[in-house]
Amino acid sequence: MKKQLIIGTRSSPLALWQAEFTKAELSRHYPELDITLKLVKTTGDVLLDSPLSKIGDMGLFTKDIEKHLIAKEIDLAVHSLKDVPTSTPEGLIITSFTEREDTRDVIISRSGETLLNLPQNARIATSSLRRMSQLLSMRPDFEICDIRGNLNTRFKKFDEGEFDAMMLAYAGVFRLKFSDRISEILPHDVMLPAVGQGALGIETRVDDEQTREIVRILNHSNTEYCCRAERALLRHLQGGCQIPIGAYASFKNGTLKLLAFVGSVNGKIGLRNEITKTGLVSPEQAEEAGIELAKELLKQGADEILSEIRKTR
């Protein structure tokens, strides 16, 4: 058994919360381990002047940490799973999917207005094309404004009066104790989340069996089924965090239900579909369900929507 572990993480407040949470959970199970953090600045942390959709680079928040993992400078990397590309670099693997926090998105508004009660032509801050597409499908009058930076930075910009409302993931808002600022939690029939939203992905080297064995204790089986289904769907659609794709899977007693959305950036076209599979006994079967739903979306015309988006990115 190893005596020391080094966790690689970004330095944002939310990333540090995630890494400290992972450290605490591992220490609870393995009190003899000496666990330290190594902070890594990623491309996504540096390039703050451009919208994520314009940078067009997969792994903006992960690949720099993965370089340290491949070089054996760290033993594991802790990521927000929604930031992790669906294909990991050769020699690396997502070993654990931690138990998922609430996956929904939230609205933060100036006077507590809910989404549909926001004023005409309201300025909504989000860096996500997925959110933009679904917002504009409901309210074409909204002006969508790009916002970058960590959660504290975003709240500072919002409080300075730049926007009428801001959309964020509930998980991050809750973890950093901003829950009292939430005006509305959006249900999945209104806003489907990003693939993997609310879960942490713990990445290790494939050949580091000792670390994989240690980290595997943090894996949450239901979350793994759900996230592997969602990630398989995204992989088959050849999407990423810069593409308007949303998905949410639930899994209970061997039954997986997967909802998915693909839309145009302007919100004028939106496809939704779902699939239910029973008797699942392995995460690989969950992935097969994700691929099956992706194929159905492609038949509906998702390929035309996504091809058009890629031309302009």
Curated annotation (Swiss-Prot):
Pathway: Porphyrin-containing compound metabolism; protoporphyrin-IX biosynthesis; coproporphyrinogen-III from 5-aminolevulinate: step 2/4; Porphyrin-containing compound metabolism; chlorophyll biosynthesis
The keyword Transferase is annotated on this UniProt entry: yes
Names of required cofactors: dipyrromethane
Superkingdom per UniProt: Bacteria
Protein keywords: Chlorophyll biosynthesis, Porphyrin biosynthesis, Transferase
Cofactor: record remark: Binds 1 dipyrromethane group covalently.
Assigned GO CC terms: cytoplasm
Enzyme Commission numbers on file: 2.5.1.61
UniProt GO MF annotations: hydroxymethylbilane synthase activity
Reactions catalysed, as given in the entry: 4 porphobilinogen + H2O = hydroxymethylbilane + 4 NH4(+)
PTM-bearing positions, type S-(dipyrrolylmethanemethyl)cysteine: 241
Keyword match Coiled coil: no
GO biological process: chlorophyll biosynthetic process; protoporphyrinogen IX biosynthetic process
Pfam families: Porphobil_deam, Porphobil_deamC
Cited function: Tetrapolymerization of the monopyrrole PBG into the hydroxymethylbilane pre-uroporphyrinogen in several discrete steps.
Note: The porphobilinogen subunits are added to the dipyrromethane group.
Subunit structure: Monomer.
NCBIfam families (alphabetical): hemC (TIGR00212)
Family under the similarity heading: Belongs to the HMBS family.
Protein name, per record: Porphobilinogen deaminase
Organism classification: Bacteria, Pseudomonadati, Chlorobiota, Chlorobiia, Chlorobiales
